[in-house]
C-alpha cells in the first residue's frame, strides 16, 4: 500500500504570493493545484539546480519567465512549494538555501547557506 504524497506550501511562498504580478499569481495558483493533486505527475518537469546547496531543490516551470522552487525528496513523500520568482532570481534563491529537519522538533526548517570566503 502506498500513501498519497503530502504537499505543503512554505511560509515564504505564501507571504510573497501577493507580491507577484496578478497574471503570474493566477498561473502559480493553477500550477499549485496540479502540484497539490499529484506532485509525481509526469506533466511536472522537475529540473535540477546544479549550483543548489540542497540537491532536493528543484526548479519547475510556471511559464516562460517564472519558475517555482520545490523541495522534491529523494525518498519520502513530503513535497514543498518554497518560492516563485523570475528564472534567474529563483535559481539564486535556491542556491543559497537548504531545507533541513530540526533534530529537536522534527520540523522542516529553511536555512540560508553562507558562501565560503575565498582566501
Over which residues does each language-model region extend?
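Enriched for short, Lys/Arg-rich terminal
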Residues: 2-4, 15, 58, 62-119
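Short glycine-enriched loop/turn motifs at secondary-structure junctions
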Residues: 11-12, 53-54, 75
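A short, surface-exposed loop/turn module that caps and links secondary-structure elements
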Residues: 34-60
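N-terminal "first-domain core" detector
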Residues: 2-20, 24-27, 31, 46
Amino acid at each position: 500500500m502506498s500513501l498519497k504524497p503530502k504537499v505543503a506550501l512554505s511560509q515564504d511562498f505564501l507571504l510573497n504570493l501577493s507580491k507577484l504580478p496578478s497574471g503570474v499569481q493566477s498561473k502559480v495558483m493553477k500550477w499549485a493545484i496540479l502540484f497539490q493533486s499529484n506532485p509525481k505527475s509526469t506533466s511536472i518537469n522537475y529540473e535540477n539546480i546544479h549550483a543548489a546547496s540542497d540537491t532536493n531543490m528543484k526548479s519547475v516551470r510556471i511559464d516562460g519567465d517564472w519558475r517555482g522552487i520545490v523541495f522534491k525528496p529523494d525518498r519520502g513523500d513530503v513535497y514543498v512549494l518554497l518560492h516563485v520568482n523570475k528564472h534567474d532570481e529563483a535559481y539564486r534563491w535556491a542556491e543559497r538555501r537548504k531545507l533541513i529537519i530540526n533534530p529537536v522538533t522534527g520540523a522542516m526548517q529553511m536555512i540560508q547557506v553562507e558562501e565560503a570566503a575565498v582566501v
